[in-house]
Amino acid sequence: MKYTKLDKSLYINNRKRFSEHLESGALAVFNSNDIFGTSADSSLPFVQHRDIFHLSGVDQEESILLVFPDSSNKNHREILFLKETSPLIAVWEGAKLDKKQAYEASGIKTVYWLDQFETIFNALVVESSCVYLNTNEHTRANTEAQTREDRFIYWFKEKYHAHNIRRSAPIMHKIRSIKHSLELGQMQKACDITEKGMRRILDFVKPGVMEYNIEAELMHEFLNSCSRGFAYTPIIASGKSACVLHYIENNNICKDGEVILMDFGAEYGGYASDLSRSIPVNGKFTQRQKDVYNSVLHVKNEASKLLVPGKMLNDYHVEVGELMQEQLVNLKLISLEDIKNQDASWPAYKKYFMHGTSHFIGLDTHDVGLWTEPIDENMVFTIEPGIYIPEENLGIRLEDDYVIQKSGEPINLMKNIPIELEEIEELMNK
């Protein structure tokens, strides 16, 4: 592993928190992700399923976790099933976890090889009152490709069609949204690596560089800092491309007088960071660019004061929309008449700020969490307002990651990353 693994006490605690939400006599099942093939004998790098990782710390394919707190056999209240390693596998693929290593990573004492799964699982299902199965219930999930979890659910329903099924996803969304101090440490590390990348870019950008040159510089810094790379596909969008919210081609030349909108973040230990900065290609903002930049920064700073415990996310987004509306009027992008005649379902400000301000972040960049419950301590959110003006070939977004406190304003995990335009200009022209 490139990263420092967290102590198993975290995963023991996470399983305890999960178990507290289960019905009496319930059995829960979690599967690892597949290794996804591309063509011929090629495949994408393995990325572990966030839920089994959150509950076990095991970062290995072909793994299954069972949680059965009320089992009559105390050795079967937590079970990990792993692919059995061998000298041949070690030569071709590298060493896999043995049972002792699996315990050291997860705190799970009972570890079996995968070929024993069906026999043991059958005995546990018979004893259980219901079975919690795991599905991807993220509001923006792409569910076209069948996953290992999907195949398991199909198999389970065929074999155990008379058994009661429950959903693990609502529980996972709840417990994953509240971060442990150890998780926050990993997220801070990811943000610190992202800072290194950002400072490298401020010293690198000049007219004539390609967007992909910037992407390459970032990847260099991330890999050198023990990150596995980008937490998500980076956006390096110069000029008018900055008005395409998910522009990922990164293949244009950065021209004198343009602003580059960059949205990127390092991954560390499975945890994401998510940063947006907008910088002038030539190191100097024009007055108009400054005005738009400062409007976005004002909204971001004021939004951070609103992101507090007890508030509902929907209410928070309405309040931020009002902040943005005021700034767009000041910039003469919308008028009071536009506001008076606006469609309530799509306010006038959305012509220039059409996305949300904040999302959960953690093991996933767009992490799971419940919008139906109030903001709570140790949740982590982005704050990322933006203004996009295609007719001016200008798009500016500013984004940092924030940890909710017990009271008062959140803590900015990216507070050391330059954001004031004067500092950005100074660093680009030193």
In which residue ranges do the predicted regions lie?
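Active-site neighborhoods and metal-handling regions in enzymes and metal-associated proteins
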Residues: 1-430
